Design a protein with these regions (language model features):
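PP2C/PPM-type serine/threonine phosphatase catalytic domain
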Residues: 1-168
């Protein structure tokens, strides 16, 4: 029986604040040794979003290095942010979105929380793999709003889930 050929991965990563904000709360992890590529976006407007996104990836990578599965590693990141926000006044409410892909040969696992997205880019098309945990996406899902309306809606940046949010 022949073994599947290893998948060659070529990647590049860049994170910019954009044209609206002057401060970037993103963190990136590109770890081919773990088969992991991840982005965490600290909660803009919340206390210490850059701390939350960095902590999310630190915990995610650490858990995977210890042999945890991706889902368990994401949960560890969530708990770490929730715990870090508790003892320090002014940090309550800090949180982060997360999108992570883990490759194993020619298969992959995908995890996400919030509205950071994962796409599969092929030679013929681009396919969104994740599904936003956002207020506007929930409205689209139940037919109360079109995707076009969601792109312009004043609540388009309201997310329903994030790492560090108590009660998830």
């Amino acid at each position: 029986m022949s073994q599947p050929s290893p998948v060659s991965v070529v990647f590049a990563a860049q994170s910019v604040a954009g044209q609206v904000r002057t401060h970037n709360e993103d963190a990136l992890a590109c770890r081919p040794d773990l088969g992991l590529w991840a982005l965490a976006d600290g909660m803009g407007g919340h206390a210490r979003g850059e701390v939350a996104s960095a902590l999310a990836l630190e915990e995610l990578v650490g858990a995977l290095q210890q042999g945890e599965e991706l889902f368990a590693a994401v949960h560890a990141a969530h708990l770490a942010i929730a715990a870090a926000a508790q003892p320090v006044a002014g940090e309550a409410g800090m949180g982060s979105t997360l999108v992570a892909v883990r490759l194993n040969g020619d298969e992959f696992e995908l995890a996400w929380v919030g509205d950071s997205r994962a796409y599969r880019i092929g030679s013929e098309h681009i396919e969104q793999l994740s599904h936003d945990h956002s207020w506007v996406q929930a409205m689209v899902d139940v037919g109360r709003m079109s995707a076009e309306e969601a792109r312009e809606h004043p609540r388009r940046n309201v997310i329903l889930q994030c790492l560090g949010q108590v009660g998830q």
